[in-house]
């Protein structure tokens, strides 16, 4: 669906002093977002091209283990002590959030939970973000790798939205494969499939938009 030539064309913009992200821009049509909400998680087969920040909420018995795999680890007591400014900052900074199942009620009632909810980042079982109390290294290593390659799609109000699919450091073939995976998954989630898509563009953060669908 997305060709290597289209990826090359999207690279033609001026070089920047930072590593740009490849993004697909979707424009939907004939979808009433008041009745239908597009919410899904997509694992990119060729990865994101960079490490994504992940926040974990676990019991004190699992904190040391979790710190090996996640960027910030909070316990029940840490949740209680968060002020509004810190909670808001944590919710904004982290792309994924995981939490032990037995701590979900407390997370939901906390300041952090409120800001995560606003951003659509509350731990979701569909993405494997709800943890059992008996954690182990093999489990967390696999989860870290999976989440690092997982993008979140949460469309509530606007028929135009973007999905990150990699960085400019990645090979053209990898970007094309990731793009196909995301487009096919979005189509499968829409009420009328491809008929609900008006257009799809591929672009770098500061680059030209190339129509791919």
Curated annotation (Swiss-Prot):
GO MF annotation: an example: tRNA binding
Keyword Transmembrane helix assigned: no
GO cellular component: large ribosomal subunit
Keywords assigned by UniProt, alphabetized: Repressor, Ribonucleoprotein, Ribosomal protein, RNA-binding, rRNA-binding, Translation regulation, tRNA-binding
Keyword Repressor in annotation: yes
Pfam families reported in the protein's UniProt record: Ribosomal_L1
One of the GO BP terms on file: translation
InterPro entries in alphabetical order: Ribosomal_uL1, Ribosomal_uL1-like, Ribosomal_uL1/biogenesis, Ribosomal_uL1_3-a/b-sand, Ribosomal_uL1_arc
Family: Belongs to the universal ribosomal protein uL1 family.
Functional summary from the UniProt entry: Binds directly to 23S rRNA. Probably involved in E site tRNA release.
Assembly information from the UniProt record: Part of the 50S ribosomal subunit.
Protein name (Swiss-Prot/TrEMBL): Large ribosomal subunit protein uL1
